[in-house]
Regions:
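A conserved regulatory-domain signal marking ACT and ACT-like small-molecule sensing domains
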Residues: 1-99
Length: 99
């Protein structure tokens, strides 16, 4: 089963995290998502020259908050972690990154 294909496109968000690597970034971001009912469909992370880089696709079908609220909550968490967290609807992300 491909969870990305099975999830309705209108409910997906793309979350990007970039900043200095440190312990607990994935745990902190995942905790916010779990608390607000956002299911993680896909996650990819790497370390590039001491910088943490993560791209996460989440399904908001069961979320208890709207996209704007989630974006604000994650941005606040990013400030706390000293990383940049951007949250976009998947359609916007795809439009901005098409070739």
């Amino acid at each position: 089963m491909n969870r990305l294909k099975d999830s309705p496109g209108g409910n997906r968000v793309v979350i990007t995290v970039i900043g200095p690597d440190r312990v607990g970034i994935i745990a902190a971001v995942s905790a916010v998502l779990a608390e607000k009912g956002v299911n993680i469909l896909d996650i990819s992370q790497t370390i590039m020259q001491e910088f943490f880089v993560m791209v996460l696709v989440g399904d908001m079908a069961t979320a208890t908050v709207d996209l704007v609220t989630l974006k604000d909550l994650l941005a606040e968490k990013g400030e706390e972690l000293k990383v940049r967290i951007d949250t976009q609807h998947e359609d916007i992300f795809n439009f901005m990154h098409r070739i």
